Structures are given as C-alpha cells and as structure tokens.
Regions:
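Mid-domain alpha/beta scaffold segments of enzyme catalytic cores
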Residues: 1-258
Length: 258
C-alpha cells in the first residue's frame, strides 16, 4: 500500500497508456497516486484522470516556470478548478532559479499569492524549489504555513535545511534522487527525519530511481524509493510504506474520508 504523492501521469509522455501505468503500479504495490497539474493542459488532464480512477487524486497550481503568465484570469481559473472534490492540495508552486523563465520578483509574488490561496481554501501546498532553497524558506516563513501544512516536493537539501522546513510545518517528500549514489545529503535527511515527517514520490516521468536511473520514470517505481529509504532506516518496506501512506492521507485530508 504505497502512495506516490507526486506524479505527472497527466503529461503527454503517458498519453494513451495511463491504464497500463496504473496497472503496473498496482502490481508493485503503489495503490494511490497524486497527479500534479502545473499549467492549464496538465490541470485539465489531471482532473479527467481523477474522475476516471478512484485511487487517483489531484494537486493543481501554477508552476514557478509559468509565473510570468499568472494573471487575474489564471487565478480565477485555478480557484474554479480547486473546487473539484478530489483536489487535495495546491501546487506545485515555488521558485525556480535554474531555468529563470520569469524574474525572481515575479516568481516570489506568484508564490506568495498561491500560499495565501491555499490557506484561504484550507488546502496544503506543494513546493517546487530549484537553486532557491534559502529564498523559498524565507517566503514560507514570512507567509506562514496553514493548519493543513505543506510539502517540500523532491527535497534535495541538507538535514539542517530539512529540519528548518519541518519547524515551519512542512513535510519532506523524497523522489528517486534519494537513491542516487552521490545523494548523501538527501540520504541523511531520509534516515534522520521523524517518520511522520516524510513522504515518497516519483515525479514521473522524471528522476527515475536506481535501478532505473536514466530511463523514463514510472509511478510504479515509488516501490524502489520505499525499498531504499526503508533500508536506510533499518525497517521493513511494509512499515515504511504504511507510515508514508498514513502521512499522505493525513496531509491530503483523506484519513477523515475513509
């Protein structure tokens, strides 16, 4: 019973084979998935998929690489789509200083606004941060985390940074990057954080874990992330899967609906 808390089954790479991907995931014990939409086409597809499959949920928001296109019309669109009963979070939102498709001040403004929306709507928010960890921290700290909390998606910082984010009310999510040989900082985080503060994800079709590194990632491969982190922590894969699934269901508000 594994919950992939961040996958992009809604992108073109998976078009026409979503059922196959969901079936393979089930074979490997991945029984719930959070489909993340980050622009209009992927948001629309995410909502179509969650309507079709009981075990799928959606997170929708405006990605930092799209921050330059955020308008009042886009915000109205998001507010409408966020009403969908299977939307469990707002995201992925944040800062991306790697691609810099929008100026820092524009990214910051859009990030802050969407954090505010998440709190207004009583939803957790999901954060994308790349080459921008310190600024991301300062913005979350100044805006504050609502009672539903937030998720640091595909975390790639140190234990010190992870603990700072956890103190703000965030939960740390690990993608296949944790399995990479040189990812020693991330492995330390996955080993040392309290069990109730961690989640697992794929970010499929990106960031495939070892032993599939370099290939297309698939939501089924959350299994490899679970296996790796459970070994790090000296516990069984079943124990880690149960704990991270319970964490996801709590954050997404699914524990009260079951």
């Amino acid at each position: 019973m594994i919950f992939d808390t961040h996958t992009h089954l809604n992108v073109e790479e998976f078009a026409g084979r979503e059922a196959e991907e969901i079936a393979l995931a089930a074979e490997m014990g991945v029984t719930q998935m959070n489909i993340v939409g980050f622009d209009q086409p992927t948001i629309e597809r995410a909502l179509e998929l969650v309507d079709e499959y009981d075990q799928l949920y959606a997170t929708i928001g405006w990605h930092p690489t799209e921050a330059g296109t955020y308008t009042e019309e886009i915000e109205a669109y998001l507010l409408d789509k966020l009403k969908h009963p299977k939307v469990v979070a707002l995201g992925e939102i944040g800062l991306d200083y790697h691609w810099m498709t929008a100026p820092k001040e524009v990214q910051e403004q859009v990030f802050r606004r969407q954090i505010q929306l998440s709190k207004d709507l009583d939803l957790p928010f999901v954060v994308h941060t790349r080459d921008a960890l310190e600024d991301t921290y300062e913005i979350i700290k100044s805006e504050g985390v609502g009672p539903r909390g937030g998720i640091m998606h595909s975390f790639s910082g140190t234990l010190e940074w992870a603990e700072k984010f956890v103190e703000l009310g965030m939960t740390i999510s690990f993608s296949g990057v944790v399995t990479f040989k040189k990812a020693t900082d991330i492995q330390e985080v996955a080993k040392e954080l309290p069990l109730d503060k961690i989640l697992v994800e794929t970010d499929a079709p990106y960031l495939a874990p070892v032993p599939k590194r370099g290939r297309e990632n698939r939501t089924a491969y959350t299994r490899y992330v679970v296996d790796f982190i459970s070994d790090l922590r000296g516990m069984t894969a079943e124990e880690l899967a149960a704990a991270t699934t319970a964490n996801a269901e709590r954050i997404f508000g699914l524990d009260s609906k079951q």
